[in-house]
Amino acid sequence: MIARVPFDEGSLTGTLTLDSKWPKEDWRSTYFVPENLRLSVEHADALKPLIPANSTMAEMALRFILNNPDVSTIIPGMRKIRNVEANTAASDKGPLPGELHAELRKHRWERKPTKWSQ
């Protein structure tokens, strides 16, 4: 199985805020309309206290996916060399501890189609 969009269009990088803005030609300017941005930030913020020491939310997201034995590869975004290096390092660390994985599963978010997503 190939896991795609592991950072939930960027919300699981931990860098989005309610003030995040993008250039008009950037697809995120229409994807992260206020309603979606608010929900995405709220869900990501709820995960921040769970980030392991010396880790990042992006690393935690990748390692969470690695807990699934059916996943053979993950396709994360890599706009910069540092992203490639960080993603590779996350993979080298392997899956998250079972206790943390179980805690993260409690944060599952089922996105329902809404007006902005049609």
Locations of regions flagged by a protein language model:
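A generic structural signal for secondary-structure junctions
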Residues: L16-T17, A89-D92, W109
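Conserved short secondary-structure transition element at the edge of the structured enzyme core
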Residues: A3-P6, W22-K24, V33-K93
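Short coil/turn segments at secondary-structure boundaries
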Residues: W116-Q118
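Short acidic/glycine-rich loop or secondary-structure boundary segments that cap or lie
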Residues: I2, E9-W22
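A short, mixed-charge helix-start or loop-turn motif at secondary-structure junctions
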Residues: R28-T30
